[in-house]
Structures are given as structure tokens and as C-alpha cells.
């Protein structure tokens, strides 16, 4: 079993950049780029979401997600709720937060962070 999870908080309600998770970068929306980079780290990855539109996208593209309360004041709160739901079934020793607007994060950074948590 993997002892590390990467959680990516994503929501549509950004005021400075509306609909940011669906901003196209090439052929894919930003949220998919972030997921792909995190997935390449070989850790378990989930999107922590609160919007039905994002849920529909995740379902249509087989991206693992956890629905959370839309009233969370921060991505960290969203991650906390998602983790509590996931840990009803699986326990993780290490939790890594990758922001949903980091499409160019390299999986090596995620792996390096995890190595330094030992």
C-alpha cells in the first residue's frame, strides 16, 4: 500500500480568474495537467472538489475526486475534509498538497518533497 497521498484542491469560484481550472493549456484544461503531473509521482492522487461541473469532468475522464463542502475558506480546509473521507477506507502517513493552479509542477518536485519528509 502507498503511504503517501497527493491532494489537489480545485474550485471554480476564483474571483481574479473565473473558471481557472478549465483554462485550456494545449488540449487539456489546467486541472487535468495538474492531475497528470501529480499522478506521475507514483503516489495516490485525488482532486478535492466542490463543484458539480468539475465532478462531471472528473467522472468523464476517470480522475479520482472527493466532493467537499463548497463553503470552505481555503484549499487546506478542503483537503482536510477530503482526507477525512478517504481515510475512512485507507490510511496515509504523508499528505502532499499540490495547488490546482500549478499545471507545470514537475513530478520530481513532488517525489523530492516526499523524500525529505522521512
Model-found features: residue ranges?
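N-terminal glycine-rich phosphate-binding loop and ensuing alpha1 helix
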Residues: 3-49
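N-terminal start-of-chain detector that recognizes signal peptides
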Residues: 17-20, 114-118
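Residues within well-ordered alpha-helical secondary structure of globular protein domains
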Residues: 28, 36, 85, 115-116
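Short glycine/proline-enriched coil/turn segments at helix->beta-strand junctions
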Residues: 39-44, 60-64, 118
Amino acid at each position: 500500500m502507498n503511504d503517501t497521498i497527493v491532494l489537489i484542491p480545485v474550485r471554480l469560484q476564483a474571483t481574479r480568474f473565473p473558471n481557472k481550472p478549465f483554462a485550456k493549456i494545449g488540449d487539456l484544461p489546467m486541472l487535468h495537467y495538474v492531475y497528470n503531473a501529480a499522478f506521475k509521482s507514483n503516489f495516490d492522487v485525488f482532486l478535492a472538489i466542490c463543484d458539480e461541473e468539475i465532478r462531471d469532468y472528473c467522472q468523464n475522464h476517470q480522475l479520482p475526486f472527493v466532493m467537499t463542502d463548497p463553503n470552505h475558506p481555503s484549499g487546506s480546509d478542503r483537503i482536510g475534509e477530503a482526507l477525512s473521507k478517504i481515510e475512512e477506507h485507507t490510511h496515509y502517513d504523508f499528505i502532499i498538497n499540490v495547488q490546482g493552479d500549478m499545471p507545470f509542477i514537475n513530478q520530481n518536485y513532488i517525489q523530492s518533497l516526499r523524500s525529505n519528509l522521512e
